[in-house]
């Protein structure tokens, strides 16, 4: 049996090659420290686990869930956006729960694109923006993110011939992999740009609560007029260490929300109700849980920056996310650098090229192991480059 032709259009998955190399080194008995995947190394707070467990014992919670999300969770999301960002949302028309934000980001292209339509994709970026576009029959157009511009796309550089066929502009701030952040002025500019060119603006805000040094990421939807053209994806995965639970949501433009909801109704059955209720608890009690999580990430961030800069690396100082983005030393390409680092030290980092061609020359460290484990990894890296 042959697979669908559209799967052949997907770019090579570089991370699969990296996984094979890791397995090869592990087979040799080498100790491996994995700093490559953005999967928090901490479990969810006990209160969230307890909330989920209690709800699982209730028989009424084991049937099919509401397709668009239970009312309690949607009202918790409404309250969160109002109190955190000053954004008012209609829970019936402007909020949709997701099986993790990843599926929503992938499926928005299925709901919006026609064959040959163009989506504008930041480069480097989370691969699902591009891959979701391809799987929906669309064409991805790269928007370079350059360090000298703060890893912010230059929207005016997009050719008019491409804009006329465009449907979606994807953004992701705070940013993975670069850890860059966007100003409210940029958000305002992006909204006006999409209004002018009749484009849907999609911001992936999965890291909006992972921020340091008194920095407070803003919501795209806090810009006046944003809901006319924009939606924002969010997730409980990173904020509450719930990556395996698969609970996320999207808010904003009601026409885009409606289209995505219609598509999802035909391909999935929503999020398990006890997990939605646990997510409700997490949002309602976020002030109790988030500070300890941020404290751990800040300590790890500071440790990594100190070690890398002492070893001579050029490091982008993150205000947000749990990543550190640094330049590859010397003349090596990013994949061979990470391969060499793995074989010589046992430390796994992510090559920038895995996020797009404009990620070449960089590598990403995920702050997702304990501080002691991270210190060991940094000592190994610094010893190798001394």
UniProtKB/Swiss-Prot annotation:
Residues with the N6-(pyridoxal phosphate)lysine modification: 238
SUPFAM superfamilies found in the cross-reference section: PLP-dependent transferases
GO MF term list: L,L-diaminopimelate aminotransferase activity; pyridoxal phosphate binding
UniProt KW Transferase keyword: yes
Pfam family, one: Aminotran_1_2
Keyword Transferase among UniProt keywords: yes
Pathway assignment: Amino-acid biosynthesis; L-lysine biosynthesis via DAP pathway; LL-2,6-diaminopimelate from (S)-tetrahydrodipicolinate (aminotransferase route): step 1/1
Keywords attached to this entry: Aminotransferase, Pyridoxal phosphate, Transferase
Cofactor(s) of this protein: pyridoxal 5'-phosphate
Enzyme type, top EC level: transferase
EC code: 2.6.1.83
Record-linked Gene3D superfamilies: Aspartate Aminotransferase, domain 1, Type I PLP-dependent aspartate aminotransferase-like (Major domain)
Chain sites annotated for binding substrate: 13, 38, 102, 126, 176, 364
Catalytic reactions of this protein: (2S,6S)-2,6-diaminopimelate + 2-oxoglutarate = (S)-2,3,4,5-tetrahydrodipicolinate + L-glutamate + H2O + H(+)
Annotated positions binding pyridoxal 5'-phosphate: 67, 101-102, 126, 176, 207, 235-237, 246
One of the protein's GO biological processes: lysine biosynthetic process via diaminopimelate, diaminopimelate-aminotransferase pathway
PANTHER family xrefs: AMINO ACID AMINOTRANSFERASE, L-GLUTAMINE--4-(METHYLSULFANYL)-2-OXOBUTANOATE AMINOTRANSFERASE
Family: Belongs to the class-I pyridoxal-phosphate-dependent aminotransferase family. LL-diaminopimelate aminotransferase subfamily.
Record note on quaternary structure: Homodimer.
Functional description taken from the UniProt entry: Involved in the synthesis of meso-diaminopimelate (m-DAP or DL-DAP), required for both lysine and peptidoglycan biosynthesis. Catalyzes the direct conversion of tetrahydrodipicolinate to LL-diaminopimelate.
Protein name stated in the entry: LL-diaminopimelate aminotransferase
Naturally occurring in which organism (per UniProt): Natranaerobius thermophilus (strain ATCC BAA-1301 / DSM 18059 / JW/NM-WN-LF)
Encoding gene (name): dapL
């Amino acid at each position: 049996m042959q697979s669908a032709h559209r799967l052949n259009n997907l770019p090579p998955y570089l991370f699969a090659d990296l996984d094979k190399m890791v397995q090869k080194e592990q087979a040799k008995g080498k100790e491996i420290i994995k700093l490559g995947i953005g999967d928090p190394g901490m479990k969810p707070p006990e209160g969230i686990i307890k909330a989920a467990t209690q709800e699982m014992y209730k028989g009424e919670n084991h049937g099919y869930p509401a397709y668009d999300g239970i009312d309690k969770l949607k009202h918790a999301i409404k309250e969160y956006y109002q109190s955190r960002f000053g954004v008012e949302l209609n829970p019936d028309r402007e909020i949709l729960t997701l099986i993790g934000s990843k599926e929503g980001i992938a499926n928005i292209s299925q709901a919006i694109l026609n064959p040959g339509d163009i989506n504008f994709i930041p480069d480097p970026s989370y691969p699902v923006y591009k891959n979701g576009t391809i799987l929906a029959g669309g064409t991805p157009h790269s928007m370079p993110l350059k360090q000298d511009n703060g890893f912010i796309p230059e929207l005016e550089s997009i050719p008019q011939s491409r804009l006329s066929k465009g449907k979606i502009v994807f953004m992701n701030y705070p940013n993975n992999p670069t850890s860059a952040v966007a100003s409210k002025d940029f958000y305002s500019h992006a909204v006006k740009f999409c209004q002018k060119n009749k484009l849907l603006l999609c911001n992936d805000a999965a890291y909006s609560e992972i921020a340091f040094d008194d920095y407070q990421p803003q919501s795209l939807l806090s810009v006046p007029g944003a809901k006319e053209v924009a939606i924002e994806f969010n997730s409980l995965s990173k904020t509450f260490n719930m990556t395996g639970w698969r609970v996320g949501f999207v808010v904003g433009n009601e026409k885009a929300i409606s289209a995505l909801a219609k598509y999802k109704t035909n391909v999935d059955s929503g999020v398990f109700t006890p997990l939605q209720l646990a997510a409700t608890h997490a949002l309602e009690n976020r002030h109790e849980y988030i500070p300890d999580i941020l404290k751990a990430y800040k300590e790890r961030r500071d440790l990594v920056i100190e070690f890398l800069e002492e070893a001579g690396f050029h490091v982008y100082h993150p205000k947000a996310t749990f990543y550190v983005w640094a330049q590859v030393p010397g003349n090596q390409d990013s994949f061979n650098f990470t391969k060499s680092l793995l074989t010589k030290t046992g430390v796994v980092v992510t090559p920038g090229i895995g996020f797009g061609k404009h990620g070449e020359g960089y590598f990403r460290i995920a702050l997702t192991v304990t501080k002691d484990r991270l210190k060991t990894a940094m000592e190994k890296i610094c010893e190798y480059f001394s």
